[in-house]
Amino acid sequence: MAVWQAASGKVYLPPSTPVARVQSTDEYVQRTNIYYHAYSDRLLTVGHPYFNVYDVNSAKIKVPKVSGNQHRVFRLKLPDPNRFALADMSVYNPDKERLVWACRGIEIGRGQPLGVGSVGHPLFNKVGDTENPSSYKTQPNSTDDRQNVSFDPKQLQMFIIGCAPCLGEHWDKAIPCATDNPPPGSCPPIELINSAIQDGDMADIGYGNLNFKALQQNRSDVSLDIVNETCKYPDFLKMQNDVYGDSCFFYARREQCYARHFFVRGGKTGDDIPAGQIDEGSMKNAYYIPPMNDQAQYKIGNSMYFPTVSGSLVSSDAQLFNRPFWLQRAQGHNNGICWFNQLFVTVVDNTRNTNFSISVNPENADVSKIENYKAESFQEYLRHVEEYELSLILQLCKVPLTAEVLAQINAMNANILEEWQLGFVPAPDNPIHDTYRYIDSAATRCPDKNPPKEREDPYKNMKFWDVDLTERLSLDLDQYSLGRKFLFQAGLQQTTVNGTKTLSSRVSTRGIKRKRKN
């Protein structure tokens, strides 16, 4: 007998309100055929590879920390194209349009030879080697078994291009719940934190993206360069799912490492191996069989195992730098438009990680007159140097000042319209205002307590390597290495129209092949 039954499945209805659609910049930004080449000076930095060196008489930094494992974040300042004195005034209408820059190509130049740098700690928390032990090593009676250990970090090459700072992630100490009431010495809860990657932030060298300063109180579990730092890693998942995609137009990454040594930590184990799972009458737990009382294994060793990583071979065959990259389509909705006339370039490269060893005789004695070598007669110093050069291909673009476009930009970032001086200016209620000459003197009234403030830099509290390119632009692309590469790969040729150099497609003609007569 057939019986009708109501559908038991759930019915999903569309949202009552329409979902706002974010447009791509290609839908409202009009690109021109005018291109500029921008380049920086040779950017150099020198410092100590492990820590800041302070003046003994004050807290002033004498030698800054410059490590090959740090992030270098360049903030490139571009000129305002709306203030350009263009020879061809038909390029855009300032009453109906605004000009912006679009990044079409970039080359990050790196100087200095390839080299492997070592990191370490003179008091490294390493009790023994657990890779190939020949005898069972019990926990010694000594209260301090730290060793002087060094190793090479994980090999890392990476750069990220965007018009906003790169978003990073790291694990940090979290606040426990009030109802938990953990006892002293308990492992604290940890949480994932997102923050902008700034210049000088340490990258992951093989021990994870962690706040080591807050979560490793023994100050001996990692190397000196990160023991008092926070290692950050770019949050690619969040940047790829960003609505606008300003933090990352595109990126290139190459990581490489392998476990070279296997050690065990010293100290008391916080999480003991579970021994409560007792079998029926066998007195055996689920993880090991208890040893005899007269054996060395009776006092079970530490189970805090960890490897020391190695970046292995450094080769010029796998370099991301000193080569051009062209941007045709960005991963987000922002297809390379440099809002606020700025570009952020986040770089990590520890394939040029050589640390210079400099030895100095404190007595300033002539080397030829030193008879015998004594180690205490020389002072050893470490220095690390880095060399960069940035080149860009910028395309001039137009943004029409229509209601739809302005609404889209206002929803994205209203400060862009303020910078374009498109804010609503009310009519003055009184054309005549009072202006005092000696407003700061005691004879006149107090000045206004709330004077109008200029728009503050949203990144003023962040640390970046500022590079001014406002006077480093050129229309002569064929006079520069990156410009010639761009003209060749795009199949373009440079022409001059009304005093403005533009690019047009190169058309090649072939002669008619005649048939050979017999």
Swiss-Prot record:
Stretch forming the signal peptide: none
Entry's Gene Ontology molecular function annotations: structural molecule activity
Name the UniProt record assigns to this protein: Major capsid protein L1
Regions annotated as coiled coil: none
GO biological process: endocytosis involved in viral entry into host cell; virion attachment to host cell
Lineage, top ranks: Viruses, Monodnaviria, Shotokuvirae, Cossaviricota, Papovaviricetes
Region listing for Disordered, in residue ranges: 127-149
Any Gene Ontology CC annotation: T=7 icosahedral viral capsid
Bias type Polar residues, positions: 131-142
Sorted UniProt keywords: Capsid protein, Disulfide bond, Host nucleus, Host-virus interaction, Late protein, T=7 icosahedral capsid protein, Viral attachment to host cell, Viral penetration into host cytoplasm, Virion, Virus endocytosis by host, Virus entry into host cell
Family matches, as SUPFAM superfamilies: Group I dsDNA viruses (SSF88648)
Species whose genome carries this gene: Human papillomavirus 21
Family indicated by similarity: Belongs to the papillomaviridae L1 protein family.
Alphabetized InterPro entries for the sequence: Capsid_L1_Papillomavir (IPR002210), Capsid_L1_sf_Papillomavir (IPR036973), dsDNA_vir_gr_I_capsid (IPR011222)
Main function: Forms an icosahedral capsid with a T=7 symmetry and a 50 nm diameter. The capsid is composed of 72 pentamers linked to each other by disulfide bonds and associated with L2 proteins. Binds to heparan sulfate proteoglycans on cell surface of basal layer keratinocytes to provide initial virion attachment. This binding mediates a conformational change in the virus capsid that facilitates efficient infection. The virion enters the host cell via endocytosis. During virus trafficking, L1 protein dissociates from the viral DNA and the genomic DNA is released to the host nucleus.
SUBUNIT field: Self-assembles into homopentamers. The capsid has an icosahedral symmetry and consists of 72 capsomers, with each capsomer being a pentamer of L1. Interacts with the minor capsid protein L2; this interaction is necessary for viral genome encapsidation. Interacts with protein E2; this interaction enhances E2-dependent replication and transcription activation.
Chief localisation class: virion
UniProt-listed Pfam families: Late_protein_L1
Originating gene: L1
Record's subcellular location: Virion; Host nucleus
